[in-house]
Design a protein with these regions (language model features):
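A short glycine-centered flexible hinge/capping loop motif at secondary-structure junctions
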Residues: 206-210, 417-421, 458-462
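Terminal intrinsically disordered/low-complexity segments used for targeting and assembly
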Residues: 1-66, 126, 150, 234-281, ...
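Sec/SRP-type N-terminal targeting helices
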Residues: 72-73, 89, 136-164, 214, ...
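Membrane-embedded beta-strand positions in outer-membrane beta-barrel channels/transporters
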Residues: 61, 127-131, 175, 220, ...
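Flexible, surface-exposed loop regions and adjacent strand-edge segments
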Residues: 114-119, 262, 329-333
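Short flexible linkers and secondary-structure junctions
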Residues: 11-170, 311, 315, 347-357
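Periplasmic alpha-helical coiled-coil/stalk elements that build and connect Gram-negative outer-membrane
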Residues: 11, 142, 151, 158-275, ...
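Outer-membrane beta-barrel architecture
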Residues: 86, 131-133, 302, 342, ...
Length: 482
């Protein structure tokens, strides 16, 4: 054994090791958007989309969670990772294998074999044995490999939660766009009805000798464009049904049952008081990055352990016999066994082990950099959504004022036209302005609804990891041992 240590010293790590450092969450400065946001002690609810108060949306998100092929793939990856963890863990246990064979040997009587005692006779060549092996794992290689596989299983579970959150967000955003298209269609249809009334009025004025053919032509001119916009919006609504059906893993026929949404957001989302430190355990993508770092750290341990001798305890016992009756090999005199240690050690490998350690070190640094980037992006997304929400709240007020002003202008122009105090061009301009401002108001409201979803997702969507975090990340920013 002592010799093995001396020989294994021929291969050294050569100073190869990781260089990455984890970024402490509390080291990231929060901006005014986060500091000014109302704080509470609560994170988003796991069923956060229910604040929109739309039963149809609730039902379709439930359908998507149950039927989405993307979630099914994520769940399969989790099962695969857990199975791989079981395979790795089994290497730490006692391995027992049994073998047995029964063979009857007929001996020929030709000149090559005989004549002799066995000529034209038969014998039995039988054996049965148990083989046992156990890895002592003196340097923790098998334990580290098992822990690495388990960490990867945890990572897959976090990635599944991230896939679920992304699916929920995609359904909500598609549903909001679906609702916006209905609102825009309603505006376009109302505009069409108004324009047709204007055409009828122009025609009556012409018949009464008060109007001109030019006024009638002006009233007719916008109609084709309004019809085109209506057709375009009806197409968008049909495509929206297909999109929502596909997100739920359904066919287009199921999407045809979707009715006009009835979204109503009457709540404000406050920020948790422990941001950004507790963001580590709330966002699935951050949690997955943490488990990736932990897994790569265990991979470093495996690479280090490969430089040392591997010692296994092996044994075999059983019965064997050549000759005699079929069951004669089971007698006590035919019993045999052997037991002892088996040693394998690296001596010269052309730099393979150092290359593997270098690769493991690079993998750890890559995982650390990925985690740091994920954390930075997570905090940025929270700030972005808060800035967007504050801006949209102001835009909503301005948009409502613009619609009210445009409607008042249109009403005044219409009354003046009916009384012959102005020409039709002023009415048409006022109507166009009202139509445009109504569209802007609907777009701002849809953006507000989406901004709420964006902020919830930025905070992790209520899919808390709980205690499912690497131990080294319990203390924020602590470097994973490796």
């Amino acid at each position: 054994m002592a010799l093995s240590f001396v020989i294994s010293g021929c291969i050294g790590t050569g100073g190869i090791g990781p260089k990455g450092d984890l970024l402490p969450a509390d080291s990231l400065a929060t901006d005014q958007a986060i500091q000014r946001a109302a704080l509470s002690a609560h994170w988003p609810n796991q069923q956060w989309w229910r604040v929109y108060n739309d039963p149809q949306l609730n039902r379709w998100i439930e359908l998507a969670i149950l039927g989405s092929p993307s979630l099914a793939m994520a769940a399969a990856r989790v099962r695969d990772a857990r199975a791989m963890a079981g395979v790795a863990e089994s290497a730490e246990s006692l391995q027992v294998q049994g073998t047995a064979s029964l063979a009857r040997h007929e001996w020929p009587s030709d000149q090559f074999y005989g004549p002799g005692a066995l000529a034209d006779s038969h014998t039995w060549d039988n054996n049965a044995s148990l083989g046992l092996s156990y890895a002592l794992d003196l340097w923790g290689r098998e334990r580290s490999a098992s822990e690495q596989a388990l960490d990867l299983a945890h990572m897959s579970a976090a990635e599944q939660r991230q896939a679920q959150l992304e699916l929920q967000e995609n359904v909500v955003r598609a549903y909001i766009q679906f609702s916006l298209n209905f609102a825009r269609l309603e505006i376009a249809q109302a505009t069409l009805a108004q324009q047709q009334q204007m055409l009828e009025l122009a025609q009556r004025r012409l018949k009464g000798g008060l109007g001109t053919h030019f006024e009638v032509s002006q009233a007719e001119a916008p109609l084709p464009e309004i019809h085109r916009q209506i057709d375009e919006l009806e197409e968008a609504i049909a495509l929206g049904r297909n999109q929502l059906a596909a997100l739920a893993g359904k066919g287009p026929g199921d999407g045809a049952t979707l009715q006009r949404p009835a979204l109503a957001l009457n709540t404000e989302l406050t920020l948790p008081s422990a941001l950004p430190a507790q963001l580590l355990g709330q966002r699935p993508d951050v949690v997955a990055s943490q488990w990736r770092v932990a897994a790569q750290a265990r991979g470093l341990d495996v690479a280090h352990a490969n430089f040392y001798p591997n010692v296994d305890l092996v044994a075999s016992l059983g019965y064997m016999a050549t000759g005699g009756g079929m069951l004669e090999f089971l007698t006590g005199s035919k019993f045999s066994y052997k037991a002892g240690p088996a040693l394998t050690l690296p001596i010269f490998d052309g730099g393979r082990l150092r290359a593997e350690l270098g690769r493991a070190s690079a993998g750890y640094d890559l995982a650390v950099a990925h985690y740091n980037q994920t954390l930075v992006t997570a905090l940025q997304s929270v700030s972005d959504q808060l800035i967007r929400r504050a801006s949209l709240d102001k835009q909503q007020v301005y948009a409502a004022e613009s619609v009210a002003s445009a409607r008042k202008t249109y009403d005044i122009a219409m009354i003046a036209y009916q009384r012959g105090l102005t020409d039709y061009l002023n009415v048409l301009n006022a109507q166009t302005l009202l139509f445009r401002q109504q569209q802007v108001q609907q777009q701002v409201e849809a953006a507000r609804l989406s901004a709420y979803a964006g902020l919830v997702v930025a905070l992790g969507g209520g899919l808390s990891a709980g205690n499912d975090l690497p131990a080294a990340f319990v203390e924020t920013g602590k470097k994973v041992d490796h």
